[in-house]
Curated annotation (Swiss-Prot):
Gene3D superfamilies (UniProt xref): Glutaredoxin (3.40.30.10)
Similarity comment: family membership: Belongs to the glutathione peroxidase family.
GO terms under cellular component: extracellular region
InterPro entries reported for this sequence: Glutathione_peroxidase, GPX_AS, GPX_CS, Thioredoxin-like_sf
Name of the protein in its database record: Cuticular glutathione peroxidase
GO BP annotations listed: response to oxidative stress
Annotated glycosylation sites: N39, N92
Length: 223
């Protein structure tokens, strides 16, 4: 195969991958789900940074956190463009966004940890995109299945699923499939200033951040 045909075939494959979305939903499911409040918090967990070091989420005490499982080659990837403006508008600096790359949905995050930031800057969303100082991108992890990260196991236990249907089996790169699984890339969990998960949002429940902003404001007003 010539180099030109090889490049073309890779481009076609990439377009097919990017075009894959999770299951379509009706408007009745776009309302965020409220989480069960318990004594356990996200501060009990550690996560891996891009350099391989571990970081305790207790370092985010007294912050409102938006936790997002992200992917570079997803139809929802352009939501990255909304993250920085939302953080810029958060004048008191209370809000932090924590992004966790995951490759479990149609293999839409194939990059290694050391490649992730370059992929975001030069490929998708591209155009020199770099994260705001309060946008933190961590190492890749699994959000579902046998090896789901303890943080995500906790979030799923505390917050009901956003939709009643998980999706198509061939698009989900994990086992076993659970009823409370993260549905697709860019699902979001909103955590209050005490580290308690409060709301869970479907990836489509976004609208350039306007669908989530009222709930962020609500948690920021809390003492």
């Amino acid at each position: 195969m010539s180099a030109q045909l090889l490049i073309l075939s890779h481009m076609v494959l990439l377009q097919l991958i990017v075009a894959q979305l999770g299951p379509k939903i009706g408007k009745q499911f776009l309302k965020p789900k409220q989480c069960e409040i318990t004594n356990q918090t996200v501060y009990d967990f550690q996560v891996q940074m891009l350099n391989g070091a571990q970081k305790s989420l207790a370092e985010y005490r007294n912050k409102v956190l938006l936790i997002v499982n992200v992917a570079t080659y997803c139809a929802y990837t352009m939501q990255y463009r909304d993250f920085n403006p939302i953080l810029e508008s958060n004048s008191n600096g209370t809000l932090n966004i924590l992004g966790f790359p995951c490759n479990q949905f149609y293999l839409q995050e194939p990059a290694e940890n050391h490649e992730l930031l370059s992929g975001l800057k030069y490929v998708r969303p591209g155009h020199g995109w770099e994260p705001h100082k309060n946008m933190h991108i961590f190492g890749k992890l699994e959000v579902n299945g046998e090896n789901d990260h303890p943080l995500y196991k906790f979030l799923k236990e505390r917050c009901p699923p956003t939709v009643p249907v998980i999706g198509k089996r061939h698009q989900l790169i994990y086992d076993p499939i659970g009823t409370n699984d993260v549905i697709w890339n860019f699902e979001k969990f909103l955590v209050d200033k005490k580290g308690r998960p409060r709301y869970r949002f479907h990836p489509e429940n976004w609208v350039q951040g306007t669908a989530v902003k009222p709930y962020i404001d609500e948690l920021e007003r809390e003492i």
